[in-house]
């Protein structure tokens, strides 16, 4: 049945997805989403504002319904028009190469002769471990304890000052 054979009342009772399917079947070619909306508006005899509340749901339904396929540039069509092998070619947007201005790159040549080659057999791991152990032994835990004590004393002084200020404020309120 052609879309034009439906009465205005029948069209208003149909789901927008069903109307879209009828439009695609009649046109037999992909249609941009905006043109599809415009044709639906004219068929239903409503304004875009009146249809506005239903447009989001309609777009969601188009995406979910397996009969439709989104092609490039907001163009939609019926999936049945495209054999499986052709789908990848039609649906993938063409990638435009961006032209970039060539940047001048100054490369500093590294003189590899400056670096000394080290043979792994020449490295004495025992000596390195001894150095690490010596550094660990020279670390003094008492230094940390003294720093902690100093911080605690400062915090205690601040608390005492705050308590004094609070007591002074209470006395002022009583007077």
From Swiss-Prot:
Keyword hit for Transport: no
Region (Disordered): 110-175
Domain HTH HARE-type residues, every copy: 14-81
Pfam families associated with the record: HARE-HTH
UniProt keyword annotations, A-Z: DNA-directed RNA polymerase, Nucleotidyltransferase, Transcription, Transferase
GO biological process, one term: regulation of DNA-templated transcription
GO cellular component annotations of the record: DNA-directed RNA polymerase complex
One GO MF term attached to the UniProt entry: DNA-directed RNA polymerase activity
Function summary: Participates in both the initiation and recycling phases of transcription. In the presence of the delta subunit, RNAP displays an increased specificity of transcription, a decreased affinity for nucleic acids, and an increased efficiency of RNA synthesis because of enhanced recycling.
Assembly and binders: RNAP is composed of a core of 2 alpha, a beta and a beta' subunits. The core is associated with a delta subunit and one of several sigma factors.
Protein family (similarity comment): Belongs to the RpoE family.
Annotated protein name in UniProt: Probable DNA-directed RNA polymerase subunit delta
Protein's organism: Bacillus velezensis (strain DSM 23117 / BGSC 10A6 / LMG 26770 / FZB42)
Protein encoded by which gene: rpoE
């Amino acid at each position: 049945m052609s879309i034009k054979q439906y009465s205005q009342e029948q069209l208003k009772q149909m789901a927008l997805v069903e109307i879209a399917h009828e439009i695609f079947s009649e046109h037999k070619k992909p249609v941009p989403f905006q043109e599809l909306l415009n044709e639906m508006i004219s068929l239903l005899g409503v304004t875009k504002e009146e249809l506005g509340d239903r447009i989001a749901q309609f777009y969601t339904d188009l995406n979910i319904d397996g009969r439709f396929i989104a092609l490039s540039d907001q163009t939609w069509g019926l999936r049945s028009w495209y054999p499986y092998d052709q789908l990848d070619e039609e649906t993938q947007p063409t990638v435009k190469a961006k032209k970039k201005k060539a940047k001048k790159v100054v490369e500093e040549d590294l003189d590899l002769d400056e670096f000394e080659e080290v043979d792994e057999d020449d490295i004495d791991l025992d000596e390195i471990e001894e150095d690490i152990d010596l550094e660990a032994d020279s670390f003094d835990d008492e230094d940390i304890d003294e720093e902690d004590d100093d911080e605690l004393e400062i915090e205690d002084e601040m608390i005492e000052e705050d308590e004094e200020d609070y007591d002074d404020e209470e006395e002022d309120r009583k007077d």
